[in-house]
């Protein structure tokens, strides 16, 4: 039996898959406990003497098509935004993906939430272009993150935001 558990650390986003028997004593399981692709025509209730299955396994049928739209690209686009009250893990780049637009919007919302303690007192807002998405950031946030007040290249923004998460920059900014 396989169960997927979410670990208690939401910042890392690790998922642990537990595969094991829940019963304490080992023993043969009946055919009712087996999945359809594990059953043979003449199942004896315990051992399956065949080394290879009868045909192609279909438990993951269609998953390759789904993965094409949900997996992130191979470029090193993920980075962490460190802020005193919380940590935001953002992977804003999902190339060739249906979820790309939604991920960019979620990333913008996460950045805005993490910067709210600074944003609420500064009504002057500057547009910041990020991978086809415009983030409205106040000038104080741009100065604190050392971002220029004009639209810049997305890789430069990613590099500056990543540098803000390092220990050297945290010591300078705080």
From Swiss-Prot:
Record's keyword terms, sorted: Plasmid, Signal
Signal peptide: 1-31
Region Disordered: start-end pairs: 39-59
Top-rank taxon: Bacteria
Entry protein name: Uncharacterized protein YubH
Organism of provenance: Escherichia coli (strain K12)
Designated gene of the protein: yubH
